[in-house]
Each structure stands twice: as structure tokens, then as C-alpha cells.
A protein has these predicted regions:
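Positively charged, aromatic-enriched nucleic acid-contacting surfaces
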Residues: 31-32, 36-141
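N-terminal, Lys/Arg- and Ser/Thr-rich interaction peptides
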Residues: 1-37
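Interfaces that engage single-stranded nucleic acids at replication/repair/recombination sites
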Residues: 2-3, 134-158
């Protein structure tokens, strides 16, 4: 088995599942978390049983700096590794508005970082999304890949 088999199967990102953002003055391409979870579920199986986080810890020792540190073990069928992340817990610099979604945001960001180590959405992290020609090719490639799938009949949902 090729060491890059998983990487090669998950490295191309559907541009429709991304959006441009400005974070701290940096222009980035963010990936929709549910898209990442779907990709990982396709590769590994259901979240929480065959892949996900275990031993989750939130460390508040840097709280006086406005930071909380997330640490967990990311597991998947081929192994596991420790991942950590930090996030600001305040919505403002005056430290008057607590971000009550900080834990969810921190875990989601850690999931993105963990999956990126395995090659998920590697084209974004390798800077390919800065090239519009690449983005157009990725859109074409992902459209062809998903075309054979059956479309959802929305009339049955009403």
C-alpha cells in the first residue's frame, strides 16, 4: 500500500465547500466543518467510533491572557496522535464579552488541524487555492467526482 493513498484520496477540496475569510489581517480560505466531517466519515467510518477525539482536556492556565488550550488524542483506523490548539475566550479586547462558543470553535479548529496532518484539504494548506486556475480545476474535478451520486429528492422532505 502506498503511504500517500489516503492523502491522495482526500487532498483535493471542493471550492463550493470553502469561503474566503480575513482572520487577524490574514486572508485565508476556510473549509466548512461538516464537509470535512463527511470526508473523514467516507474515509474512516462513523465519527466517534472509528475516528475522532479522545482524552479531551481544556487547560485554563492561560485564562488571564484570554486563552484556553485544547488538547486531545486524535484517533483513526491507522493510529492516533496528540493535537492541541488554543483560542481566545473573549469576543472583544476589553474582555467584557465572553465567547460562549469558544469550546466548539476550538474543537472544530483542532479537528481541521488533525485532518490536515493526514492530507485532508491539503491543496488549501499548500497554498494552491491562491491560484484561481487551480481552484477552477478543483471545482471541475470535484463536480465530476460527485456527479454520479444520486441527487436528494427534496419533494420527499416536505
Amino acid at each position: 500500500m502506498s503511504n500517500l493513498k489516503l492523502w491522495d484520496s482526500v487532498c483535493v477540496t471542493d471550492p463550493a465547500m470553502t469561503k474566503k475569510a480575513n482572520v487577524g489581517g490574514n486572508k485565508i480560505t476556510s473549509i466548512k466543518p461538516q464537509y470535512q466531517i463527511k470526508m473523514a466519515t467516507e474515509a474512516f467510518g462513523p465519527y466517534g467510533t472509528t475516528w475522532g477525539f479522545s482524552d479531551i482536556e481544556y487547560n485554563y492556565s492561560l485564562e488571564h491572557y484570554g486563552l484556553v488550550v485544547f488538547k486531545a488524542t486524535f484517533f483513526f483506523p491507522e493510529g492516533e496522535f496528540v493535537i492541541s490548539n488554543s483560542i481566545k475566550i473573549w469576543k472583544d479586547n476589553a474582555k467584557t464579552k465572553l465567547d460562549d462558543d469558544f469550546a466548539k470553535k476550538c474543537e472544530t479548529d483542532a479537528l481541521t488541524k488533525a485532518l490536515s496532518k493526514l492530507g485532508f484539504n491539503a491543496d488549501i494548506f499548500m497554498g494552491y487555492f491562491d491560484d484561481m486556475r487551480y481552484v477552477e480545476q478543483a471545482a471541475s474535478m470535484t463536480a465530476q467526482k460527485s456527479a454520479p451520486k444520486q441527487a436528494v429528492d427534496n419533494s420527499k422532505l416536505i
